[in-house]
Structures are given as structure tokens and as C-alpha cells.
Amino acid sequence: MEEKYIPRNVEEKWQKIWEENKTYKVTEDPSKPKYYLLEMFPYPSGRIHMGHVRNYSIGDVVGRFKRLRGFNVLHPMGWDAFGMPAENAAIQHKSHPAKWTYENIAYMRSQLKKMGLSYDWDRELATCDLDYYKWEQKVFLEMYEKGLAYKKTSYVNWCPKCETVLANEQVEDGACWRCDSEVTQKELEQWFFRITDYAEELLEYTEKLPGWPERVLTMQRNWIGKSYGCEIDFPVEGSLAKIKVFTTRQDTLYGATFMSLAPEHPMALELTTPDRRAEVEAFIDKVKKTDKIKRTAEDFEKEGVFTGSYCINPVTNRRMPVFLANFVLLDYGTGAVMAVPTHDQRDFEFARKYDLPLQVVIQPEGETLDPAAMATAYTEVGTMVNSGTFDGLRSDEAKEKIADYLAKEGIGTKTVNFRLRDWGISRQRYWGNPIPVIYCDICGVVPVPEKDLPVVLPMDVEFTGEGGSPLKKLDSFVNVPCPQCGQMARRETDTMDTFVQSSWYFLRYCCPDFAAGPIDKARAEYWMSVDQYIGGIEHAVLHLLYARFFTKALRDLGYVTVDEPFTNLLTQGMVIKDGAKMSKSKGNVVDPDALINRYGADTARLFSLFAAPPEKDLDWSDQGVDGSYRFLSRVWRLVCDLLPFVGKGGAVDSASLSDDARGLRRAVHKTIRKVTDDIDERFHFNTAIAAIMELVNAIYAFEPKNAPENGPVLTEAIESVVIMLSPFVPHVTEELWEALGHQGGVEAAGWPSFDPSAAVDEEFLIVVQVNGKLRGKVTVATDATEEQVKAAAFADEKVKPWIEGKQLRKAIYVPGKLLNIVVG
């Protein structure tokens, strides 16, 4: 082997071997335990960044470790390839989205291969491939048939320049994230998936995912937002109409003094009197320009407008003015809030601003609240007052009694409410999966017959940058005969939200070549669920919740048998440099290509895994990268130095080992135990690598290396180092393994076996205290008696001064740990 470690030579050699031999190609094998490992697939933006390097290196360690442990590992890679950036690039660079996307995929694939990642590339998929999205169209039609896909009118975030719907996350300070135009609220017909049908199950199963971070589960529970309360009808004064309210605080009903409606509420204009109409319409227009997240923020100024109408509190008969309020949303509860300013902080601020009445109905223990003197709302449990027959009860006890009373009187009903809303999937963009629906003036909404699938996304479109979908302007796509009556009809021009594609890709990886449907049930049965999923915390709610929903929906459609897609979830931290997340705008980006060209992929991997535990942020350090390279060079030199002495002398004979050889073997097996536990149980790759580094130091220090009797111990030690390092740095370890005389690759060797007898310490370090204070430490044999421990302690030079000339009262011995000498 070469004397000097030259990463490029080593890495190019082994990458070529892996590719030619399809080393990581995998098929179903019932004789082996399966392990499905997956990192969230990337958007093909053009180049990988250091976040990708870290994320995929984490996954690769797990995959390689599991293979060494005898698992049949599925570790695929693909591309989340539809989406708006490709259209933006088409407009800016006069390049078709398909060309831009596939060129990016080709480059990024080459980058990932240079990292030495153990993917089964035969399973690669891109969501913009017809072979992928055609099956998604079939699933859509089946969901439509089951009532899980439907169309309705709803208010959406709308960018007038891009002419498309924006998710809440794409609205930044009231502006479009892409073009910075002011976002408005627009009423639009959209396609939805009925995720709310699964709200209860999605919530229930958060208790059945022990391998998920509690933080993510909490975020999902909050997003689903189950709450118990009542729906209460408030009659509108002078009308037969009623305003329906959902509340979890029916104990405060007697304190409701006004009504707040969402500006989008269907009764908003109906309740507006002629003299108030101009002001109300101006207010509604203003609120439409504010995104929902900002409207519900605690620090956002609460504003409203009086409609001119009143409703009646059904238990007090109080006249309640009806306001529109900017902080009330139509898609939570009923879009109407009974305002109790004394016991809700937002209502309190609103009431003070518009000089509305306050009525205390819950008093703190031993205190009397004066509405005029209140500086904040009282929101804790207390004693009911001004609440009719419920006076004197604790407010938490009164909740159930008031709910029963409302039901008995026909005023309200007990209700369970969910914050979760159905998933709007319509996007007014070109580069996405066409929704397979046709609109006929005679037949109405007509699903595309399965025999006519797929609806192919046409390539001959023009990108003008004017906004809206180019599909709308393509007559050859839009104008089609109705499948039912044959009359000319119009094709749907909206495409599906890209979250749809990422909600089932992990299932298609099980059978990417399956030509008879979206999913081969038998193969999915073998591989699913994903044993380990790895990705960023930013996907905690949307992607992960949608993927859970889709899995359950596909289960109910008969495609899969699992209830959940991902058994275990790791959310890795960010890569930061100079105190901030790496980004082009901050000028603190490290280019992986440059790093790999200079140091090699193994060094890049080792640093990204050693610098911090996976779930923590990684602080970039040039010195750390250099240190990782030096360590690999050091291991290389060590193998070179040991080649004349290893592989000779047969198996280790424990009985004939010298003390030093026994000590080295003890270090080897302690390291095997620690590294195994750190990878398998904790994903503490940084401490696993640190333990291997310590073992390398111990091998360097071991002498004499050239003694024939030490050959077996040195062989076991250096081979264990190479195998344990191989999941982290696969190229250099394959080269070293070959240099050590092995054929068939590291994986064929299997993970080193831990020998408990070899790891047992022959000596203990005993802490010696005198009158409870640390005065020394002594080393004794593991089989030393209590008397031998005492003798060693009394003879210790550091302990002697504290006991000489003093009366020994007693000595308390904790075996193997501590001796406390009590003197007087």
C-alpha cells in the first residue's frame, strides 16, 4: 500500500468498485432481519450543501453499521423534483423546468456518489418522472371515489403577482416569499384532502411512536389541536338567525358581553347595517391583506369594527354587540367567538380599546375582582359569581354542569373540536402533478377514467413570468372531450401541492419497478414501516403529518397494512458557521465540492459526525476538519507500520498474554462495547469516534509491536479499529482492510464480537476518604479483600499524613469504589 494517505486515489477506486458491483443493491430476503433506513429526499436545487453532507452521513453510518450486524438494509435515494423554483429558473434562465431539474439531479447524484453513500441507486426515483406521478393520479382518483378528495370554496393566501396560492409558511411579514408582493386573502375553489377524517387516529397514534422526539409529537398534537367544549347558539336580535359559537370555556358564558366574528364569516355582511357597511367593507379588505399567522400573533394589534347588529346571550339575555375582529379566524371553531373580556386576554384588550362592557364571573380564592380596576384578564380557576344557579361552584367543576344545562335547555351541545383543517392541495403552477379531473358544462366534475391515465404534464408550454399557470393558456391541454357525454369540456389546470409527492415516496421505494400499480403490497409488507427516518425539525408538522395521513389512507384503500410510516425519527441539527446557519445571503457557506476535493469525502464525513451529536447544531471549524484529516492519516500510518506484524500467530491465547497485551485487549473490547452501544442505542457518533481515537492511541503506545507473541493481539486490535471506523469513513477503511490481506470487503467480516471476559478490569481504583474528605486514591486487584484495600490505603503516601498519630475509630468500605477512614 502507499505510504501516504491520498484520499482522491482511494475514494475514486472504491466508488468505482461499488458502482460496478452494485454493492448496495438489495432485494427482499426473509432469512435476514430487514432494516429500512431513509433520509428525507432533497429538492434538486443544483448542489448539495453541508446540511446534506451531515444528514446523509448520519444515515450512512446507521446503514453500514446495520449491514455489518447482519441486517438486510434498504437505503434508497431520490428527488422531490416538482415545485416552484424550477418554474422561477425557467423564467430567469429561459430553460425548461424539466431540463433544469434533470440537469440538477445529474449533478447532485454525482456529488452524493462522491460522498461514498451506500445507496441502492437502482431504486432511485424522481417525483417528476411519469412513472411516479401517474400512480399518484390513480391514488387521487381512488381518494376522490372514497370522498377523501373533494373541491370547495375557501379563503387562501394569494399572491396577485405570482397568481398562485401560498401556504402560510410562504408568507413572510405579509408578503410573498418569492416576489415580495403584498399577499391578500382570496376566495377560491380548491381541491382538498379530507385529513380531518383521520384527526382522531393521527392524534391517538402520537402515543404509539416512542421512537419519535417528544418535541415533534408535541408539535403535531398542538397542530391537530383536539379540544372539548360546547357549541352554543346566540340568537340575532330582530332575526330568526343564530350565531353558532364553539367554546372550551362554557364556565365563562355568563360573562360574555360582545361577539367577535372572523371578517370572512358568511354572516359578516348579512349582519352589517346599511350605515355601517362602508366601514365594515373597508375593514374586511384590510384584513384580507394580512396573513393568518400574523393575525393570531400575541403581539399583533387587535382591531375590529362594529357591524351595527346585536345578538342575545342565551343565559343572561344581555344584548351583545357583534364585531368583526382581525384575530378571529374562520377556519378555527365556527369563526365566531363569544367574547368574555374579564377572563380572556385578547378579549380584554379588545374591550378596553373599544370601550365594551366587562362582567366578572370567576373570582380568585379570597379576592374580589373589580372590572374597572383590572389590568389583565383573570384566566385561572376560581369561584363562580354572577352566574345564576352556578354561583359558588369551582369554575372547573361548573364546566360540566353548564354543558349539561345548555344541552337540556336546547341552547348548546357538547362538542369535540379539532384545530386541524383539511389539506388544500391545489396549486396554480405548471411544474407539478396534474389533477386528473375534467369539467363539463353538462356532467359537472368528471374524474379522468383510469384507462385514460396518466394525464401527462405537457412540455410545450411558454414561460412568460406573467404569473398564473402556463397550462391555462395551452388549448391542446385544456380542451378535451368529456369522458361521459363526449361534449367539449375543460381539463383541470391546477397541479398538486408538492407535499403530496413526498407523502408516499417511501412506499414507492419498496417497489420502484412495479408496473401494475402504485405499490406492490407484498414488497411493501416486507419493508415497511421505515425503521429509521432522518430529517430536519422544520418538517415536524406538515410533511410528517401528511405522510402519516397518506399511509393511513393508503392502508384503508388496501395498498398497505401498516398504520404508521416511520417507526423511529431523528431530527438532526443545523450546520452553523460564524454563529449563524449557513446561507448564501450571510456569506458563510462552505462548498462540499471544495472540501471533498481538498480533504476527501471521508474527512468531510468524519468531521460532520465527530463535531457534535446528530440532534445538536454543528459548529463549523476549519481546524476540526484539519484534525479529522490528520487522524485518518494517522490511522493509515499505523496500519502501514503494523503490516509486518499482523496476521501472524493465529488466534489470541488469553492465558499466555503479557500484562501489556492483556491491557491492550481489554481496551479493544471496552471500545467495541462502547462504540456498539453509542451507534446502536444512542446515535452518539461523536463519542463513538472519540473512543476509537483513544484505542488508536493505545495501539500506538503498545510495545513491543515486533514480538511474535503480540501478533494476534495487534491483529485483533487494528482490525477492530478498521471495522468500527468503516461506517464513518468507508473508503479509507476498505483500502486498509484490503491492505491487511482480506478479500470481500469490510462488510463480509461482520461487526467485531464483544468478549465480556476480555473487558474485565484486573484492577480497581479505590477512592480513599478520611473523615469524609478525599485524601487519596489507591489501585488494587479486582479480587482484593477488604483487609488488602485497607492496607493499601494506610500505606499510601497521600493518606498517611491525615491518619498518623490519630485514633482509628472505623473504616467503611464500599466494595470496588470507596474506603472512608474515620479517625479521632
Swiss-Prot record:
It is found in: Cytoplasm. A motif ('KMSKS' region) lies at residues 581-585. ATP binds at residue 584. It catalyses: tRNA(Leu) + L-leucine + ATP = L-leucyl-tRNA(Leu) + AMP + diphosphate. One of its GO terms (molecular function) is ATP binding. One of its GO terms (biological process) is leucyl-tRNA aminoacylation. Keywords: Aminoacyl-tRNA synthetase, ATP-binding, Cytoplasm, Ligase, Nucleotide-binding, Protein biosynthesis. GO terms for cellular component: cytosol. Belongs to the class-I aminoacyl-tRNA synthetase family. This is Leucine--tRNA ligase. It comes from Geobacter metallireducens (strain ATCC 53774 / DSM 7210 / GS-15).
